[in-house]
Amino acid sequence: MSASNSWFHLKVPASSANLGPGFDALGLALGVYLTCRFRHSATLSITAAGRDACGIPASPDNLIWQTALTVARNQRMTMPPIELEIHNEIPLGKGMGSSAAALTAGVVIADELLDLGWKPLRILDEAARLEGHPDNVAPCTLGSIVASAIDSGGVTRAVRLPLPKSFDLAIVVPDFDLPTAKARAVLPSGYSREDAVFNVQRAALLIAALATGTTNVFPAAIEDRFHQPYREALVPGLHEILRLRAPGLLGCALSGAGPSILVFFERGYESVCELVEQIFRLNGHASETLHCSIPERGFELTRA
């Protein structure tokens, strides 16, 4: 194989958005990955393996490829055909940023093969435009925990928080899916000033707590009135899960739009996740717990 047609290796982390009160603004990277190998090819070839591979199209409809085509079209360029091998670890339809990881991968692939020379923040901006909100694609791109917003000019602004290791986390994944569109459809068109102030206070408190490792403000820091109360009817057991209290448990929140649950806990208290599993079980659903790191880096691209 010539060096000019060697494989690129791309790894994009999963993500958990909102973190309770930070609706469409806060997200963290998870050490569960979408990995891809790609290179130039005479014709398009896509294969998919790994978790939920049956839900990943091995065809031109694939989200990674469609994203790359969109980027090329927006730049008035033509995306060359590629050989793309996908290996997925991220549960699909569970609120762990599987689509954001695919979008990010598509932007990175287009950036590399079209020689756009984009830096990570430009890649983030493009991915956020395509996703419609930055809270998942920001940690996919930058890693760690990220606060992000889209400014009045439509440009994504993001700040990555270095993480003091003061807590651990896990994702409890139930055995049912919840489409993001369905989870967004139940949200109100507006909020009272009281609820807005409630969420602003807690989002600010949460950012400060995460940045400094001040865990004694949990679980108050992850309380929310913007989205979780409205989604309780879509996630059996969510009402009880959000109110769980136990030694070592810092608090629970929906992971993104759900149905998975993000569990913050003190080191050595992994067993608190069993309480969440039990609530799902009492509501007729099996679940599994994924103990996740928070990677310091977002996507990683190397060449063989």
Swiss-Prot record:
Binding of ATP, residues: P91, L92, G93, K94, G95, M96, G97, S98, S99, A100, A101
Gene3D superfamilies per UniProt: 3.30.230.10, GHMP kinase, C-terminal domain (3.30.70.890)
Any Pfam family hit: GHMP_kinases_C
UniProt gene name: thrB
Stated role: Catalyzes the ATP-dependent phosphorylation of L-homoserine to L-homoserine phosphate.
Enzyme class: transferase
Reactions mediated catalytically: L-homoserine + ATP = O-phospho-L-homoserine + ADP + H(+)
Species this chain originates from: Solibacter usitatus (strain Ellin6076)
Entry keywords, A to Z: Amino-acid biosynthesis, ATP-binding, Cytoplasm, Kinase, Nucleotide-binding, Threonine biosynthesis, Transferase
Pathway annotation from the record: Amino-acid biosynthesis; L-threonine biosynthesis; L-threonine from L-aspartate: step 4/5
MF terms in GO: ATP binding; homoserine kinase activity
Protein name per Swiss-Prot or TrEMBL: Homoserine kinase
Family affiliation: Belongs to the GHMP kinase family. Homoserine kinase subfamily.
Compartments, record wording: Cytoplasm
Annotated GO CC locations: cytoplasm
Gene Ontology biological process terms in this record: threonine biosynthetic process
EC number: 2.7.1.39
Principal subcellular localization: cytoplasm
